[in-house]
Amino acid sequence: MQREEKQLDMLLEAVLNRLNDLKHSIGVMIHRLETEYETINWPTFLDNFALISSHLTGLMKILSTEIGTPLRNLTVLPLMLTPERDEALLQLTEGRVPIFSHDLAPDYLRTKPDPGAESRQAAHEAKANNLTVEASMKQVAQYNKVISHVWDIISKAKEDWENESSTRPGIQQTSSMADTQALVAAVGLGNGLTAPVGPPTGAGVMIPPAIRQGSPMSAVSPSGNAPMGKMPSGIKTNIKSANQVHPYR
């Protein structure tokens, strides 16, 4: 009995070590994908993936060559169930399982599918087993016919594309380098542009701002007449002397 318990402890320790290595490798890979997604290269990603694959292979090898009593013959039973938060359990599971209650224990210790999923799987298996050979062969033939039709369409499209690519002389030119250079020279340097002869008809003469600002407002009017004098005001004013005594003083 002691020998079997010792072998079981050794097996569990080896499995836990391999699981910790696997968890660490997965965490490192996820961290790199989240932080180094712009600089990570394909060989580095393949190296991380190969490391995870090696840990999985080692874990499967340990489980396949079990030492002592096979794990599938053992039963895991909870020692204590409580609806309260267990800090020791939270620390032991690295924050994943805070409570080990009556409602959660079956889900954590379940080794078979959910009863509803198991019943649906059994119904599908029974339906597949009740299918006759003729019906199954007919369905397989229809499936192969659909696959062949899709394959023919893809193959024909591939052949048409290859023929079109082989017969195409090349990329058709849609621009002229000479015309582009002439346009750039005309816009940037004015090459090829001629100025009009004589002043344009109907255009006014522009006066520089300095001349406009320095000219007085009493300049000659556009009609050539002299500026108009001061117009007489129709309002009569009565200016009194300042030394006149106010009547209300």
Swiss-Prot record:
What are the protein's UniProt keywords? Activator, Coiled coil, Nucleus, Transcription, Transcription regulation
Q: Which residues form the signal peptide?
A: none
Single Gene Ontology BP term? Answer: regulation of transcription by RNA polymerase II
Gene Ontology CC annotations of this record: core mediator complex; mediator complex
What Gene Ontology molecular function terms does this protein carry? RNA polymerase II cis-regulatory region sequence-specific DNA binding; transcription coregulator activity
Spell out the subcellular localization from the entry. Answer: Nucleus
Q: Where is the composition biased (Polar residues)?
A: 215-224, 235-249
Q: Transmembrane region positions?
A: none
Q: What is its main location?
A: nucleus
Annotated segments matching region Disordered: 215-249
The domain of life for this entry's organism is Eukaryota
Coiled-coil positions are: 1-26
Please explain the role this protein plays, according to its UniProt record.
Component of the Mediator complex, a coactivator involved in the regulated transcription of nearly all RNA polymerase II-dependent genes. Mediator functions as a bridge to convey information from gene-specific regulatory proteins to the basal RNA polymerase II transcription machinery. Mediator is recruited to promoters by direct interactions with regulatory proteins and serves as a scaffold for the assembly of a functional preinitiation complex with RNA polymerase II and the general transcription factors.
Indicate the quaternary assembly: Component of the Mediator complex.
Name this polypeptide is given? Mediator of RNA polymerase II transcription subunit 8
